[in-house]
């Protein structure tokens, strides 16, 4: 018969071993579902969010994040206002416009620091400045994406509503009409449509087009640019108990995703390709390189909104008739992004030393 004291000691020892085996094991905690509404289809434009999901950064903050693709007809501000998503990604003017109808979106992190919007033309058109667009067929996407162009035209003394000044032509979200000569100057993002031209063959040479075959007007350089991709949420949602803390943690994880994509571009492109992105690897590699150049360096830290840039954006949106009246209140805040940056500790949140890579494009962006 065993000694009762021995049995007690054995039981205690087994409990101790069991306790030691659980040291450092994560507690079983239910994840909070979070939905993020994109403004466009999955591509490297949104790489940081896909990276945060793939690398487990959102999960580390206690979130089960669903990333919802966008499309032409989807307005993220309306989706968020209707409670179908907690967070959205949007150009700032497209978030502001629904506020005139009662939406309450507020920017909580300004991720893109600079505008990537261009007007692109072939060299033989001799369009080197906005004034040269007079009498030309000028492509515009519409859907609120034309405001920088319209503001630039007006600054150059041209009326986009007057066909005697400039012939505004509806442009698809590609460069096919431009390549066919149906548009003299096409709207393009440096991270997307501009590269689409460089991925096409010049029929005169049977070689790919080169940057020197093109003239480019940058609305950022001309002074009529708008703040674009920002993370926003509903003011009413943020006012509910605990949701500001949720927002800070979401921003922290998202910023980590963008930092990862800055420092690990090749792996980040592979993550994007797994997200059902339609454009091929070569094009996504170019896109991420250019998107990183729009985000970094971030002089005050990723996500911090510059007040002067926001005010300029509002004015451009008013000039472009995206907004019909001055903005009421201050629909942006930096306090949540600042807390997220502080929570990242010693991480490089400014990217001051980051430099663009050289990306060689191939036909079709493959």
Give the predicted meaning of each segment.
Residues 1-32, 346-366:
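Short, low-complexity disordered leader/linker segments with a strong preference
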Residues 27-180, 184-191, 211-213, 217-219:
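Short, glycine-/small- and polar/acidic-enriched structural segments
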Residues 48-51, 97, 148-152, 196, ...:
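Alpha-helical scaffold segments in soluble metabolic enzymes
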Residues 66, 73-75, 166-168, 214-217, ...:
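Short linear loop/turn motifs
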Residues 84-85, 89, 293-304, 339-346:
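Short amphipathic alpha-helical segments at helix boundaries and their inter-helical linkers
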Residues 93, 125, 173-176, 183-278:
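Pocket-lining segment of extracytoplasmic ligand-binding domains
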Residues 241-324:
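Secondary-structure end/capping motifs
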Residues 311-366:
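Conserved C-terminal helix/tail region of periplasmic/extracytoplasmic solute-binding proteins
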């Amino acid at each position: 018969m065993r000694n009762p004291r021995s049995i007690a000691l054995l039981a205690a020892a087994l409990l101790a071993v069991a306790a030691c085996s659980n040291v450092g094991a994560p507690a079983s905690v239910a994840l909070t579902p979070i939905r993020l509404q994109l403004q466009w289809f999955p591509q490297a434009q949104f790489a940081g969010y896909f990276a945060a999901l793939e690398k487990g950064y959102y999960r580390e903050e206690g979130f089960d994040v669903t990333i919802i693709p966008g499309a032409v007809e989807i307005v993220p501000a309306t989706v968020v206002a209707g409670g179908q998503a907690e967070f959205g990604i949007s150009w700032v003017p497209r978030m502001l416009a629904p506020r005139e109808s009662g939406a309450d979106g507020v920017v909580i992190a300004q991720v893109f620091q600079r505008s990537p919007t261009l007007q692109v033309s072939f060299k033989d058109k001799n369009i080197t400045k906005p004034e040269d667009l007079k009498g030309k067929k000028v492509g515009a996407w519409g859907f609120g994406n034309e405001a920088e162009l319209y503001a630039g035209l007006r600054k150059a003394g041209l009326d986009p509503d007057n066909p005697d000044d400039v012939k505004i032509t509806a442009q698809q979200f590609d460069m096919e009409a431009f390549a066919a000569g149906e548009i003299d100057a096409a709207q393009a993002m440096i991270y997307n449509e501009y590269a689409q031209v460089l991925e096409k063959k010049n029929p005169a040479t049977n070689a790919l087009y080169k940057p020197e075959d093109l003239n480019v007007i940058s609305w950022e350089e001309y002074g009529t640019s708008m703040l674009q991709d920002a993370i926003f949420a509903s003011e009413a949602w943020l006012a509910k108990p605990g949701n500001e803390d949720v927002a800070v943690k979401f921003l922290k994880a998202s910023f980590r995703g963008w930092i990862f994509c800055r420092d690990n571009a090749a792996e980040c492109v592979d993550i994007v390709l797994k997200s059902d992105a339609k454009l091929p690897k070569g094009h996504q590699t170019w896109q991420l390189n250019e998107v990183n150049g729009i985000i970094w360096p971030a002089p005050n830290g990723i996500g911090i909104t510059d007040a002067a840039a926001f005010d300029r954006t509002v004015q451009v949106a008013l000039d472009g008739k995206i907004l019909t009246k001055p903005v009421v209140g201050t629909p942006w805040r930096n306090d949540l992004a600042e807390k997220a940056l502080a929570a990242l500790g010693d991480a490089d949140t400014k990217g001051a030393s980051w430099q663009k890579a050289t990306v060689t494009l191939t036909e079709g962006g493959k």
